[in-house]
Amino acid sequence: QAERVKEYMNYYILNVMEEYDPEMDQLLFYLPLSGSAFKKVYYDQILKRCVAKFVSSEDCVINYAATDLEQAERITHVVKMSSNELRKLQVSGFYRDVPITSGSVSTSDDVIDKVNELDGVSASNEDDEHMILEMHVDADVPNFEDTSGVKLPYVVTIDQYSSTILSIRRNYEPNDPNFKKKQYFVHFKFLPGLGFYGFGLIHMLGGLSRTATSVLRQLIDA
């Protein structure tokens, strides 16, 4: 049975999950630069199958006190999608079918701007794009609180521009007495860091560069 499961999983990853190899290649290229990268494994409502997508550290925001994904009380995945993709998810019933006000959200960031410059792309207000915040949180949902007072795992999805709630879903098995949250993310680190995120070549070489500059200045002053 184990052999059959292994063969099926290999077949599924290599033949059905067409995005697996390209997404993994992108992750492995990005990882040494950033120090941290993520894979998100989930069931896609549009493709009607499991997918494994690369998520950059800029698009995966963890609460400050977290030491790992299992202990994090809030994981926010910043999802960029077109109006057509958003509409498909609304029609399928995955999101609430409510009017969404369109508009641009300021995402100015020195790192993101530099990456876009290297890629040769630039942001445009004319892009038909929505910024969706998918938050995996421990929360008290009104009328669904646990009698113990413990916050339970939910996935709350919000459109960033309009602040409209698109969905609130339970993130644990209905019959689980321990309310263990489902984990969709896998964290890859290039080198261990001082906190949640890992260190990349930019962190290491940046420090060496500053040290070399300091030593050179001291030699000149001497």
Across the structure, where does each feature detected by a protein language model lie?
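Extended alpha-helical, oligomerization-prone segments that build pores/tubes and scaffolds
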Residues: 1-222
